[in-house]
């Protein structure tokens, strides 16, 4: 898969790094970033791995965790959700209930059945998505948050329409309703849906996040 070309890029960048001072973390990042003429997830994945490794070297040399070098710890624990799934609506509900029983206060799931894109109109599979989200919300109750993961399956207009229909269930977030290629269109979805939008897992630089914000 994609790991092999990323390793090849790490090996390529390693030639520049040999013999250099590993403490010059930002300098090395900027040099490698600016000298990489063709960007993309492979190049940025390699650069990210190198950046993390340089921070790891510095932390080990100083005998401190990396968070101490970045301003210090801000919390002792974080809230987690459980991603749940199921082929049928009943399977999905049972999986969500099991997560709650295990102590999770939030569950994330994709509201579409595995065959949602086969022989169904958009209206049919959107109706099914609303039905599944409603069933999970009813099963877990008001004290548990639901997070709806769309996996970039819809166009902007479809994302807005489905998002508005899901507002009644008060999702904690609405994740990747559309492809992240256009920050402006994602902004339109966020503006027209009363649900927080979660996105960014396909971004590879801080500059993409800047455009989105």
Question: Where are the model-predicted features located?
Answer:
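Conserved, mostly hydrophobic/aromatic
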Residues: 13, 50, 63, 107, ...
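Short glycine/serine/threonine/alanine-rich loop segments
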Residues: 19, 64, 104, 195
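Metal-dependent enolase-superfamily TIM-barrel catalytic cores that perform enediolate-based chemistry
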Residues: 77-192
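Active-site nucleophile and cofactor-binding loops and adjacent substrate-binding regions
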Residues: 47, 85, 178, 201-205
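Catalytic alpha/beta core domains of metabolic enzymes, predominantly
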Residues: 181-213
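Metal- or metallocofactor-binding catalytic centers and their adjacent structured scaffolds
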Residues: 1-61
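Active-site phosphate/pyrophosphate- and oxyanion-stabilizing loops and adjacent acidic/basic residues
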Residues: 56, 68, 72, 134, ...
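Glycine-rich, aromatic-flanked loop segments that form ligand/cofactor-binding clefts
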Residues: 53-87
């Amino acid at each position: 898969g994609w790991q092999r070309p990323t390793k090849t890029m790490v090996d390529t960048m390693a030639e520049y790094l040999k013999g250099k001072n590993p403490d010059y973390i930002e300098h090395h990042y900027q040099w490698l970033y600016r000298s990489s003429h063709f960007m993309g997830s492979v190049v940025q994945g390699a650069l990210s791995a190198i950046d993390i490794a340089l921070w790891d070297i510095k932390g080990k040399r100083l005998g401190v965790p990396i968070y101490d070098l970045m301003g210090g710890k801000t919390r002792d624990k974080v809230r987690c959700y459980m991603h749940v799934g199921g082929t049928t609506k009943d399977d999905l509900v049972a999986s969500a209930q099991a997560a709650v029983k295990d102590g999770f206060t939030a569950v994330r799931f994709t509201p579409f059945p595995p065959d949602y894109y086969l022989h169904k109109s958009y209206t049919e599979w959107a109706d099914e998505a609303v039905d599944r989200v409603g069933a999970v919300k009813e099963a877990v109750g008001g004290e548990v948050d639901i997070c709806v993961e769309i996996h970039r399956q819809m166009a902007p207009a479809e994302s807005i329409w489905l998002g508005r229909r899901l507002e009644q269930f008060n999702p904690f977030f609405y994740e990747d309703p559309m492809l992240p290629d256009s920050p402006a269109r994602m902004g339109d979805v966020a503006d027209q849906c009363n649900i927080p939008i979660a996105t960014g897992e396909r971004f590879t630089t801080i500059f993409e996040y800047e455009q989105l914000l």
